[in-house]
């Protein structure tokens, strides 16, 4: 593991920082509530990114973790890729979240690439990344059984999300 600061300077670790570090730094700056971030190339989530499809909310497992459809960025232009691929990847993610709350939606699919997932801590980000892959897998299986599965009704989505998140959460163990 390599630790870098928000100026992209290595703080600790023997390895080189990820080529995606600039993207991460941009997201930490744009979304102050983020305390940890994970970038994966998990199979099912990547399949949605490559197919240029957002991940719709079909069930309560999805709603327990994400408040709605997992968003997809637009494609980067050839000029954006040539100019600053990693920086412009951060830019299109931030652009996609212009009207989304990154706390309620801690994941995004980068078009033709892969997911970026975050949380209040590194462990929360990792748990969200696992949840994202699971809901992507469930959505793919839903498509197999029904090419047009119905979306989870909004009132059920909101209930499942709010009972696990926020000041009035009732799901899970009491935090000490």
Language model features: what each stretch is:
Residues 1-176:
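Glycine-rich flexible loops
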